[in-house]
Every structure is written in C-alpha cells, then in structure tokens.
Regions:
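Acidic/histidine-rich catalytic neighborhood
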Residues: 132, 139-184
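Formylglycine-dependent
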Residues: 14-71
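Short, small-residue-biased leader/transition segments that mark boundaries at the very start
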Residues: 1-13
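Soluble non-cytosolic domains of exported or imported proteins
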Residues: 60-67, 104-111, 190, 287-294, ...
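Metal-dependent active-site segment of extracytoplasmic phospho-/sulfohydrolases and closely related
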Residues: 111-156, 300
Length: 326
C-alpha cells in the first residue's frame, strides 16, 4: 500500500482546479523557517509575525499562535481565494492536557476555537465565497482525566530489562491511554516478550496487553511491516494513563492536579471527537451517528470531485447532496 503522503496526492487538488500549493505555514518545531517566503513576508508586513526568527513566534502562548494562524488563514481567503485551505488549531489540545477536560479552562479554550472558526466563516462570506464553500470542523480525539500514571519502564528497570547505556531490552513509549513496548534485543526478543507480559499482566491500571496478532483489528501495522510499531501494546484502565518515566521509585504515580490525556483505544467513547460539516454539497440535518475519522479525507476529496482509491475510509454519502461534483 502507498505511504500516507500518497493518500491525498497533489494531483487530486490540481485536477480540481487548484493552481498552487505554495502558501504554507506549517505546525512544525521550526515554524518560521518553513512557511512560503512570500506568505511569511506578507505576515510580517501585516504585523502578524515580528520577524523571521522561530524564537519570536515560539515565545507566543498557544492562544496567540492560534490567533496568528487564523489571521493568516483569513489573509489567504481574502487575497488568494484558495481551492482548499487546511487550518490546525492547537488551543483545545494544549489547555486540556494542562488542566483537564470539562474544566473552566477547557470550556474557555473551546470558546476561543469557536471564535476562530467564526473568523473563517466571516472571511468566506466577506470574500463572496459562501455559495462555493464547504467548511468541515473535525477533531482527532477526545479527552479523559486520569488520576494515576502507570510507569512500565520502572518495572523494566527493576527487572533488569533496562540498564545504563543506549541498549534497553524493553522500552515503553507512552501515548497516554496506550503505550508501545519495544523489544530491542533480537537475540532475546521472545524471552523478553514473555517476561514483559509476566511482569505487567497483573499490574494495577493495565487493562490489557495486546500482541501483534491483535494489531490489525485496531488498524495498526505489525512490527515486521513497520519498524516504528511496538512489539506489544499496553492498554490503560479507566482513570489511568501511561508515562515514560524510568527512574521513579514506584511504578505507579498519583496525579494530584487536573490533567487531561488521550491515546486510548477508539472503543472508549470519551475518545470521540467533533465532526461538523456545512455549506456547498452538504445535506441539511442528516443523522450520521458516529463518524470514522478515516472517512473525512475521502469525503472532502469527493466534494472536490475526486477519489482517494488507496484510502482506508469511504465517502460519507449520507452527508452529501447527490450527485457529487465532477
């Protein structure tokens, strides 16, 4: 199957009438180094960016960065009238990680993100593009508030599976509600696998330990096909999350302040996100139930009159007016 970078090929957009993909202001560790030079110069001229230094932009709060990205999107709508515009807002994720979901801070962050969406809608209307525009608002996950952290690496260290130096025979990498365990010594991998399962099977806070034969059902690759995939997948119980800590005394840590976490299995209803679609090609008021995130990109491609033949997802036809654009 093709890599992810090929699933939404540039030709899909060009066939739909896009003239360029050169306007880019990415969310990357060095964000000011990578935008299109023309766009970066214009944003500096508008006072949205101070200079060409990453440090100046990164000194802004998460809320201020979202404001800058939204203003850049409004500028592009006004001056470029793009065929496709993608905007990533960070404030809801940042705040809920720090303060937990369903808190005053979380609701304030949601209100701010909603205001930015309103800015986009108003820019579309001011540009005279309302009848030609579809707006999709989607989030990639929900949030839960854990009360304890499980530290698998502490267990591994105490069992002799982690020793000083670069070679650690077992290393857990947390994704919040799940964690990958990498078994890094080929000569002892199967013995280490059995040992890890034995050590963690009855550990507080761990709901399940999944081996590669269970990965496909979760849309995960097997380690032999993708070296970035772990050899085992740990699943946290309700109220727990994983950490990467290796040097704590205890393998369980009490959380004494509100925080938020995600990365739990998609079967956890708290992981459900948001999906809203409005505008050109969208039926008013359909009852969709739970929408799969893998269906979002094929649906957007369908609105552009294109197909993504290698994508795992499908077009959400109950959402769209027929016939689809060509």
């Amino acid at each position: 199957r093709p890599p992810r970078s090929k699933l939404f090929p540039y030709t899909t957009l060009f066939r739909s009438g896009a003239k360029t993909l050169d306007d880019n202001f990415p969310d990357v560790p060095n964000p000011i180094r990578h935008p299109t030079p023309r766009l970066r110069a214009q944003l500096i001229g508008l006072g949205l960016l101070r200079d060409t230094e990453d440090e100046s932009f990164l000194a802004n709060s998460a809320a201020a960065r979202d404001q800058i990205w939204t203003a850049a999107a409004v500028h592009l709508i006004q001056t470029r009238r793009p065929s496709l515009l993608l905007l990533h807002l960070l404030i809801t994720d940042t705040v809920q990680h720090r303060h937990g979901p369903q808190t005053l801070a979380a609701y304030t962050a949601l209100a701010l993100a909603d205001a930015h969406v309103d800015d986009i809608v108003r820019a579309v209307e001011a540009a005279g593009l309302r009848e030609r525009t579809t707006i999709v608002v989607a989030s990639d996950h929900g949030f839960v508030r854990p009360h304890k952290l499980v530290n698998p690496n502490v267990v591994f260290r105490k069992a002799g599976l982690q020793r000083p130096g670069p070679r650690r025979r077992a290393q857990a990498m947390s994704h919040g509600g799940t964690a990958f365990v990498y078994l890094t010594a080929p000569e002892t991998r199967e013995a280490d696998r059995a040992r890890v399962i034995e050590l963690l099977r009855e550990h507080e806070g761990i709901a399940d330990i999944l081996e590669p034969d269970k990965f496909a059902a979760l849309h995960l690759p097997e380690p032999e096909h993708n070296p970035q995939m772990g050899d085992l997948l740990l699943v946290a119980k309700e109220g727990y999350a994983f950490s990467n800590e290796s040097f704590e005394d205890d393998s369980l840590t009490e959380i004494t302040f509100p925080v938020g976490s995600h990365g739990y299995l998609a079967t956890n209803p708290n992981m459900n996100g948001v999906f809203v679609a409005w505008g050109r090609g969208i039926k008013p008021g359909p009852k969709l139930g739970v929408v799969e995130i893998i269906d979002v990109a094929p649906t957007i491609a369908g609105l552009l009159g294109q197909k993504l033949p290698h994508a795992d997802g499908r077009i959400i036809r109950a959402l769209l007016k027929e016939p689809l654009p060509r």
